[in-house]
């Protein structure tokens, strides 16, 4: 047994965000290994699908880990879209595009899409939630890229989806936010 008792203070938990991250990584692994080691690749794909479903159902049921607290919609849905697109690339199953598109709607609902009544109005950034209560920010390990990466990946694989132009608009708003932020942070931007 380990001498360091802190090992036991971080128990394994089943959370949607963690499962979406694992699902995306395992789907990528399937694509990398499918020609080289079919047995391992197929295990990766099965595990990716299982982790994806655990995450999807867990998010729908409001399950979250004690360690990190309640789900952050834009982050979880961003990684949900990423995992779904990675699984679509592996399976070509439109189910994953449908689920990713649902997460895309939530991502866009978390985005500031109009000019707020501020001295210096900014739009295009993301909130944690659809109610726009808390801005999506991190002070240590960050996941601000999750919503944008999820929308980008959706655009790559689903150009004919009815929400495609909405995803593009969301990405354009984020670009506007980054450019405006650069102006406001000169000489650092």
Residue ranges and their predicted role:
Residues 1-189:
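Glycan-recognition and catalytic cores of secretory/periplasmic carbohydrate-active enzymes
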